[in-house]
Amino acid sequence: MSVAMDTYPITPGSEPRPLFQVTDAVIEVLRRGGADLSQLGVPAQPEPEDGLWEKVSVPQARALKNIWTNSMKEAAHDDYLRWRLDDLDPLQKPNTLRNWLDSLVQAKERKGRPETLNLIVPGNVGTGKTTALAALGNEASERGLVTRFVKHATYLAWRRPDGSPDDLRAYQVRKRHVEADLLILDELCGEMDGIATEFARRETIDLVDSRLAAGRATAFSTNLKSRGAPGKPPGIADILGDRFLSRIEARAHLVTIQGPDRRKPHKPLDW
């Protein structure tokens, strides 16, 4: 007995493809996402002479932007991605931040070390320090710098066993934060009200020392003073030690942001 089989014509261009064949359409999707196409045997675009990937049409530039965006999302700071230095008010020192960013970009162009490696941004609560540094990071990621954002307490939590996100190992967490061209370490000592544990001191000093040795820039924000005073909250040196304070003050620029608490309601809540 024979069985009749229906046959259908195949439209040209829609023929079945060999298993695991990567089509041009798939490559374009991966390219837009900033994937490393060299893993698929696709030749990489030539490295720019100045070492900077700035054009968003270039996959590497989109990859740099994705690194920054993902770090902001991990910090639940999606809303801060809209800020640029031109949006800041004079109290947030946009011109100083822009000049420092220019120096970082110029250093990478000439494959050298920035003259000022650390930017320390202290100030009272709610003055817009995080907003200012987010604007700095937004523009840095668009100017060819590998830029990451992380809160100090979050970094320490990620360095603990089984504490890292996305199935990363602890050494991978350290690697990604040590190797960034610009690291924004937000709320330094933000959840510490006394002498830090040996773990916190060791991990923080290791991060800062490694970045200094590699010539990579770090911006710190904090609500604390460098040192505490009688009857006042402890300062950075009181919590992490004089050795750490000397590390971040070396080759540093101070940008103090003071002013009213921007998050405080204009009318006090009665409750």
Question: For each predicted feature, which ranges?
Answer:
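Walker A/P-loop nucleotide-binding motif
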Residues: G112-L133
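Short glycine-rich substrate-engagement loop in P-loop NTPases that contacts/grips substrate
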Residues: L97-L101, G137, S141-E179, E198
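Pre-Walker A (pre-P-loop) alpha-helix and adjacent loop at the N terminus of AAA/AAA+ ATPase modules
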Residues: D87-L119
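Loop/turn-to-beta-strand initiation segments
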Residues: L145-V146, E179-L182, A214-F220
